[in-house]
Amino acid sequence: LYGIKNGTLKKVKLDISKINDSTYISKSISTRDTIGFGVITYDRQNLTNNIFGNHKYSLFKNDTLNFEFTFDSFSFPEKPIQKRFVDYEFFVLNKSRIIKLFGNNENELRFVSKNSNGLIIREGEKATIKIKLSDYDKNNTYLILNLIGDENNYNYDSDNIFPSNKILDPQKKYLFDFNGHKLNIDKNTFLRKSKILFDYENDTLFVFNPYVEAMKNFEVKFLINRDLDGQYLTRKNHDGSSTFVSNKISNGYYSFKTKSLGKFYVDYDTITPEIKRRKRVDYKKQIEYYILDKETGIKIIWVK
């Protein structure tokens, strides 16, 4: 269960009980919030080409369709948009996907046949929510929830806390500057209001929040005072891994666009490329070599 307020989300796990092989039920929910629902589910014989698992997700309020995904087909540009319906914070923490059955009414998407920004539950209102999960062969599973418009009978989970100093409204553009390091964020880069840490400390530029995902590129300009052989910019990711970003300096900056937040710093490539000959000669009598560089990649191959 999600609470939707002022562009932010809070959630709490609901306990459900099995009624029969195809139907589950939850205890009555008392609330006066704007709410939404999310599910963790999968299909053992999934025949759909999507990141969600099931073929169709439907949500009804008092038997009226409120929201529906249908994965008959979708265009290639819609593939990244599917991620908007996944709880990214939960995925980072648990490596499991909650599919959100609410979204943005402004998007006209082929795989969304009915869209809603959530359910507004008013004082004294009573409603029955039915969530229907369907596989490709039209086998269905149902979840029934009863809503009462009253004071909440539950508490949302606490937010995951991390250091932050900027709150971003997705409807605004931002240009931040910290000691010459620049961050340029366009409108609608993030799906909802998001907190990030933008700071520079111990030779590291922080553009960081492990629990949010950018929907489109933002621009970073990393100020550099000197250029040494083997020098390049890298990004430290939330899981501790490092990713090569750039080794090109222009007008005193590493300037690049990315969707990935992280901690950016200068590193040095001290490992020479590896060249390995394939042991056997193929049927065309060709000799093959494998060329690998684990840090910055291969820039030029010269053969004599």
Regions found by a protein language model. Give the residues of each.
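Long, low-complexity serine/threonine/glycine- and acidic-rich segments characteristic of extracellular
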Residues: 7-153, 253, 266, 294-304
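Beta-strand-rich domain onsets/edges
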Residues: 266-286
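Proline-centered linker/hinge motifs at extracellular inter-domain junctions
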Residues: 1, 174, 270-274
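Proteolytic-maturation and junctional protease-sensitive modules
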Residues: 185, 211-264, 293-295, 299-304
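Proteolytic processing hotspots in large secreted/extracellular or virion-associated proteins
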Residues: 154-171, 192-236, 276-278, 283
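Structural beta-strand segments of beta-rich domains
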Residues: 33-37, 216-220, 285-288
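Predominantly extracellular/luminal regions of secreted and cell-surface proteins
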Residues: 171-193
